[in-house]
Curated annotation (Swiss-Prot):
<feature type="binding site">
    <location>
        <position position="18"/>
    </location>
    <ligand>
        <name>Zn(2+)</name>
    </ligand>
</feature>
<feature type="binding site">
    <location>
        <position position="16"/>
    </location>
    <ligand>
        <name>Zn(2+)</name>
    </ligand>
</feature>
<dbReference type="InterPro" id="IPR034704">
    <property type="entry name" value="Ribosomal_bL28/bL31-like_sf"/>
</dbReference>
<keyword id="KW-0694">RNA-binding</keyword>
<keyword id="KW-0689">Ribosomal protein</keyword>
<dbReference type="InterPro" id="IPR002150">
    <property type="entry name" value="Ribosomal_bL31"/>
</dbReference>
<dbReference type="InterPro" id="IPR042105">
    <property type="entry name" value="Ribosomal_bL31_sf"/>
</dbReference>
<dbReference type="InterPro" id="IPR027491">
    <property type="entry name" value="Ribosomal_bL31_A"/>
</dbReference>
<dbReference type="GO" id="GO:1990904">
    <property type="term" value="C:ribonucleoprotein complex"/>
</dbReference>
<dbReference type="Pfam" id="PF01197">
    <property type="entry name" value="Ribosomal_L31"/>
</dbReference>
<keyword id="KW-0479">Metal-binding</keyword>
<dbReference type="GO" id="GO:0003735">
    <property type="term" value="F:structural constituent of ribosome"/>
</dbReference>
<keyword id="KW-0699">rRNA-binding</keyword>
<comment type="function">
    <text>Binds the 23S rRNA.</text>
</comment>
<dbReference type="GO" id="GO:0006412">
    <property type="term" value="P:translation"/>
</dbReference>
<dbReference type="GO" id="GO:0046872">
    <property type="term" value="F:metal ion binding"/>
</dbReference>
<dbReference type="GO" id="GO:0005840">
    <property type="term" value="C:ribosome"/>
</dbReference>
Length: 69
């Protein structure tokens, strides 16, 4: 690798909106990153995931032409 062209790779604190914080490494200049979701509050990881059927294109097709079994 060429010397002097790569940004510094330093420890960075990631702060989630739920209040969870953890340390990782990044090239961020500020030393902190703000995240909207993390593994502590994301529905997929917490098991609180809801499956919503909004009646999309597939449901509309099935209503129109009948669902074939």
């Amino acid at each position: 690798m060429k010397q002097g062209i790569h940004p510094d790779y330093r420890e960075t604190t990631v702060v989630c909106t739920c209040g969870n914080t953890f340390t990782t490494r990044s090239t961020s200049q500020s030393g902190t990153l703000n995240a909207d979701v993390c593994s502590k509050c994301h529905p997929f990881y917490t098991g609180k995931q809801k499956i919503l059927d909004a009646g999309g294109r597939v449901a509309r097709f099935e209503r129109r032409y009948g669902k074939k079994n």
